[in-house]
Each structure stands twice: as structure tokens, then as C-alpha cells.
Amino acid sequence: MAVPTSVSLVLASVTAVLIFSAMQMYKPLIASSQMATVFGGFLGSWLFILSLTAVSNLEAVVLGKGFQAKLFPEVAFCLIGSLFACGMVHRVCATTCILFSVAALYYINRISQKVHNAPVPVDTYAGKKKKK
């Protein structure tokens, strides 16, 4: 069941702050092994998705329901922020964060297009050709 935009804004913001603080608290553990570093990048991609959700919901609350997040500045700003957060933990976390974030953004875009873009019927009328 979907929640209202304002509730989604609060939930995404709080969860993003919790993920950021957990990454900073467990920085030595995340940087200790290769798998933990990849997991840190995965957490960073969740930070990206949640911050993008929060920014998009904030724009929807302030600017109206029809507003959509664009590649620049919303997506770029959130990606740079999550890369900065991952880079403070480990450099490889930032690299894997890019990979996971791009993949997540692709699938979220596909789901969004399926849900929100209704197919438009195409008019296939050929018409009569004039003889000269």
C-alpha cells in the first residue's frame, strides 16, 4: 500500500540518515574485507535511492504533484552525495556504489514507466492517395 508523499519524504529522509550514520559508525568494519567493501557500495546505492526519493518527494510537496526529478540536478546531486559518503568509508565503496546505483536507477526507471506511462493508442489511418 502506498503512503502519502509527505510520509514518504519523512521515511526516506530518516532511513537515508540512518544508513549514512551506520556507514560512518561501522567504517572500520566495512573497510576490513573485500566483501564488506562491496556491501558498503551496496549500502551507498540505497543511500542514493533514498536521498533521491526524499528530494523528489520534497519537490512534489513544495512545487506540486506534476513535478518530476530530472537527470540534472536531482539525480546528479544525490549520486554525488552518496559517492561522497561512500568515499569517506573506502574508495572501492564509491566505485561499487556507482555500479549499484546506475543499475538501481535503470530498474526504477523501468518500473516507473510501466506504472505511470499509459499506452497511447496509435491511429493507423492510411488515407487515400490522390491521383495526379
Swiss-Prot record:
Subunit of the oligosaccharyl transferase (OST) complex that catalyzes the initial transfer of a defined glycan (Glc(3)Man(9)GlcNAc(2) in eukaryotes) from the lipid carrier dolichol-pyrophosphate to an asparagine residue within an Asn-X-Ser/Thr consensus motif in nascent polypeptide chains, the first step in protein N-glycosylation. N-glycosylation occurs cotranslationally and the complex associates with the Sec61 complex at the channel-forming translocon complex that mediates protein translocation across the endoplasmic reticulum (ER). All subunits are required for a maximal enzyme activity. The chain crosses the membrane at residues 1-21, 35-55, 69-89, 92-109. Keywords: Membrane, Transmembrane, Transmembrane helix. It comes from Aedes aegypti. Component of the oligosaccharyltransferase (OST) complex. Pfam families: Keratin_assoc. Belongs to the KRTCAP2 family. One of its GO terms (cellular component) is extracellular space. It is found in: Membrane. It is a multi-pass membrane protein. InterPro entries: KRTCAP2. The keyword Transmembrane applies. This is Protein KRTCAP2 homolog.
